[in-house]
UniProtKB/Swiss-Prot annotation:
The record marks K69 as: Lowers pKa of active site Tyr. This is 1,5-anhydro-D-fructose reductase. PROSITE patterns: ALDOKETO_REDUCTASE_1, ALDOKETO_REDUCTASE_2, ALDOKETO_REDUCTASE_3. It comes from Rattus norvegicus (Rat). Its main location: cytoplasm. Inhibited by p-chloromercuribenzoic acid and alkyliodines.
Length: 301
């Protein structure tokens, strides 16, 4: 199993015009892990940045760890390989280091990423993520991807997958939203107890209902004490919990700042204070899919 680099560059909501440069800056600064997805509709631009840096000799392909995700409209077994090949072509790569099932929910196949009925609810596909997983395993066997994993799975869903009869390849990670306001302790303990790593997306929070994690008084106090930025504290917090972290930025100075997190350590008291901020505040709730049989957030974790 490949070791996933601890800090990666997230590319969600990075506009195509900005993301090529962001990737090039990141590679120059030492990033080797890049988190992509079909849904972000910017994979070809990410690929351009990677290709240029390989061509310049700054980095070799085997030094990079490139992740992408299978979108929900491709959960039918017969569509999984097509989706993966589309992503590989967009990124201009021969293989992915890691391919994730983006959400446990399958949607009706077609040209709409999120097919909705008249009442604004998602139209599901009649698929099971357990069947989808078999097609994911085939991708590893065929050499298109090196590792496979999941994203946004709750503990029951992950448990069902790990206990699937005839499981050939285990998921190596569960990529989930995680920050001090949603610290995910139960789910992380569950994953780590079963040798599944956890990758934290939205580690810097972002905003919903005007909630800005970076303005939190406790986080600012700890940042000041260490002479670091709030973002660096939020990233370091997850590293010390043995998580992989994928902060997103297209700003060169923030891309640099987000990886300068290995020259200091949070104290036990800092960690306790950060953990105590939990308020179960989920930002990525995907409300149009709440009707789906595999919606992951109806249970506690």
């Amino acid at each position: 199993m490949h070791q996933i680099p601890t800090v990666g560059l997230g590319t969600w909501k990075a506009s195509p015009g900005e993301v090529t440069d962001a990737v090039k800056v990141a590679i120059n600064l030492g990033y080797r892990h890049f988190d992509c997805a079909y849904l972000y509709h910017n994979e070809s631009e990410v690929g351009m940045g990677i290709k240029e840096k390989i061509k310049e000799g700054v980095v070799k392909r085997d030094e990079l760890f490139i992740v992408s995700k299978l979108w929900c409209t491709y959960h039918k077994q017969s569509l999984v390989k097509t989706a993966c090949i589309n992503t590989l072509e967009a990124l201009n790569l021969d293989y992915l280091d890691l391919y994730l099932i983006h959400w446990p929910m399958g949607f009706k196949p077609g040209d709409k990423d999120i097919p909705l009925d008249r009442s604004g609810k998602v139209i599901p596909s009649h698929t099971s993520f357990l069947d989808t997983w078999e097609a994911m395993e085939d991708l590893v066997i065929e050499g298109l991807v090196k590792n496979i994993g999941v994203s946004n799975f709750n503990h029951e869903q992950l448990d069902r997958l790990l206990n699937k009869p005839g499981l050939r390849i285990k998921p190596i990670t569960n990529q989930i939203e995680c920050h001090p306001y949603l610290n995910q302790k139960s789910l992380i303990d569950f994953c780590h107890g079963r040798n599944v790593s956890v990758t934290a997306y939205r580690p810097l929070g972002g905003s919903r209902d005007g909630v800005h994690l970076m303005d939190d008084i406790v986080i600012r106090k700890i940042a000041k004490k260490h002479g670091k930025s709030p973002a660096q504290i939020l990233i370091r917090f997850q590293i010390q919990r043995n998580l992989i972290v994928i902060p997103k930025s297209v700003n060169p100075s923030r891309i640099r700042e987000n990886i300068q997190v290995f020259d200091f350590e949070l104290t036990e008291k800092d960690m306790e204070e950060l953990l105590s901020l939990d308020k179960n505040l989920r930002l990525a709730t995907f409300p149009s899919t709440e009707n789906h049989k595999d919606y992951p957030f109806h249970i506690e974790y």
